[in-house]
From Swiss-Prot:
It comes from Stutzerimonas stutzeri. Residues 529-542 have a biased composition (Polar residues). Residues 446-548 form the CBM20 domain. This is Glucan 1,4-alpha-maltotetraohydrolase. GO terms for biological process: starch catabolic process. Coiled coil: none annotated. Belongs to the glycosyl hydrolase 13 family. Keywords: Calcium, Carbohydrate metabolism, Disulfide bond, Glycosidase, Hydrolase, Metal-binding, Secreted, Signal. Monomer.
Length: 548
């Protein structure tokens, strides 16, 4: 054992251990949210297979360092399974996006198996967790020469049993997809095991750090929990439950429930976060003030921590190219900046749509918001309070390092009207319709005790898949020497150098070190920086460097 590793083991033994939930990368309620500090990029749009046929994995590989430098800790990848389907209704056509796959072969319209592995390796090496979109509910059972053979009449398919309509039957415990003839019986032991083994394969061979479960209205949430337990228990997961109260039958309790209650119930049973369609519905149908009614704005942190917030995605929003993509529920252009300002400064796990980030000119604005979120230490379960008496939406968000005051389409004059202390303006966009202030960095922000932004750098941080470089030190903002509370550095554009900005009290002598640990299990400390501690006296814009 090297002296560095020996020191790391000894240090870990002497430090307080995190809870078991923390060790597993789960919330206190055992939900797989990976610590609640993820910022996810949706790594595709609907027309990718037509705009960049057979080349998308190469593009993701080439963009890996940029994605990491932009502040994303995870990427939602397209469905990796082969889909050569096609459809046309006269005015529109499509197919091949992965949502009507026919087998688990990875040589599809996004690129080859080898290109997928290279992209996953590049992203993982840059510190970006790979989350695969998976579609267990249905498949293209009629495609010739597929590598999966599930004969009819043996209980593998929904329509092997009598179908009462769009309700569960003896061969399917969820809603049917379109007519239901393509729906798999995920409760059948062979079908269940087929997916369990494939999820394990994606984790072990293709760098999966988690999964996005498509169309979860089609199968029991408990099945998602079982798959995760059996194949990737410490990984991230999120479910797409796009089903409003009115879509449930009159005898179902969800028919008179709220969107929040419906999606939270799914999360409780699946033990996975869930897309915040409660917030999306308010973005589409309510005023900006109504955005507080999303799952991420719930007064209970156990509700906020499971919310995966988004503005638009490949289904709801527009895409470059043919027919503008799906755009089933697209947010109006005039609210896109306000929506990103909200999800990137508030609780929940935010997802940024690829086209908003890299195609349509919102990238610089989104980068600025990501930096504000990271510096403030806003997490999925951060506290949020809303303030009435003003137009638009006004909220105060308490991060681990700074407090943010957010005003959207509001007549709020200054943050002092709703929060005490010193604040400085962090964001002012859309002619004042988007304003964000942060605590501790106003004029005089260099005075002792005020929070200032310090750039941290750790050199020589070579890591394995699933590990990252962290800064840990002798103040609460640096975790009080606890690896479980250390601050992850997210800029890996110069890998193996890792960088990040951390807000620290000005004028106080502080000490810190670099360390490498597993992202999901804080007890798995791989390496502590050797030698003496790094020392600094924080001031606004200062830089401090450590070396592993």
């Amino acid at each position: 054992m090297s002296h560095i590793l020996r020191a790391a083991v000894l240090a870990a033994m002497l430090l307080p251990l995190p809870s078991m939930a923390d060790q597993a990368g789960k919330s206190p309620n055992a939900v797989r949210y990976h610590g609640g500090d993820e910022i996810i990029l949706q790594g595709f749009h609907w027309n990718v297979v037509r705009e960049a046929p057979n080349d998308w994995y190469n593009i993701l590989r080439q963009q890996a360092a940029t994605i990491a430098a932009d502040g994303f800790s995870a990427i939602w990848m397209p469905v990796p399974w082969r889909d050569f389907s096609s459809w046309s209704d006269g005015s529109k056509s499509g197919g091949g996006e992965g949502y009507f796959w026919h087998d688990f072969n990875k040589n599809g319209r996004y690129g080859s198996d080898a290109q997928l592995r290279q992209a996953a390796s590049a992203l993982g090496g840059a510190g970006v967790k790979v989350l695969y979109d998976v579609v267990p509910n249905h498949m293209n059972r009629g495609y010739p020469d597929k590598e999966i053979n599930l004969p009819a009449g043996q209980g593998f398919w929904r329509n092997d049993c009598a179908d009462p309509g769009n309700y569960p039957n003896d061969c399917d415990d969820g809603d049917r997809f379109i007519g239901g003839d393509a729906d798999l019986n995920t409760g059948h032991p062979q079908v269940y095991g087929m997916f369990r083994d494939e999820f394990t394969n994606l984790r072990s061979q293709y760098g999966a750090g988690g999964f996005r479960f498509d169309f979860v209205r089609g199968y029991a949430p408990e099945r998602v929990n079982s798959w995760m337990t059996d194949s990737a228990d410490n990984s991230f997961c999120v479910g797409e439950l796009w089903k409003g109260p009115s879509e449930y039958p009159n005898w179902d309790w969800r028919n008179t429930a709220s969107w929040q209650q419906i999606i939270k119930d799914w999360s409780d049973r699946a033990k996975c976060p869930v897309f915040d369609f409660a917030l999306k519905e308010r973005m589409q149908n309510g005023s900006i003030a109504d955005w507080k009614h999303g799952l991420n704005g719930n007064p209970d942190p156990r509700w906020r921590e499971v919310a995966v917030t988004f503005v638009d995605n490949h289904d709801t929003g527009y895409s470059p190219g043919q027919n503008g993509g799906q755009h089933h529920w697209a947010l109006q252009d005039g609210l896109i900046r306000q929506a990103y300002a909200y999800i990137l400064t508030s609780p929940g796990t935010p997802v940024v749509y690829w086209s908003h980030m890299y195609d349509w000119g919102y990238g610089d604005f989104i980068r600025q918001l990501i930096q504000v979120r990271r510096a403030a230490g806003v997490r999925a379960d951060s506290a949020i309070s809303f303030h009435s008496g003003y137009s638009g939406l006004v909220a105060t968000v308490s991060g681990s390092q700074q407090t943010l005051v957010v005003a959207l389409n509001s007549d709020l004059g200054n943050p002092g009207q709703v929060a005490s202390g010193s604040f400085s303006e962090a964001v002012n966009a859309s002619n004042g319709q988007v304003r964000v202030w942060r605590s501790g960095t106003g004029s005089g922000g260099g005075e002792p005790g005020a929070l200032v932004s310090v750039s941290f750098r750790c050199d020589n941080g070579a890591t394995q898949m699933g590990d990252s470089v962290y800064a840990v030190g002798n103040v609460s903002q640096l975790g009080n020497w606890s690896p479980a509370a250390a601050l992850r550095l997210t800029d890996t554009s110069g890998y193996p150098t890792w960088k990040g900005s951390i807000a620290l009290p000005a004028g106080q002598n502080e000490e810190w070190k670099c360390l490498i640990r597993n992202e999901a299990n804080a007890t798995q400390v791989r390496q502590w920086q050797g030698g003496a501690n790094n020392s600094l006296t924080p001031s606004e814009g200062a830089t401090t460097v450590g070396r592993l």
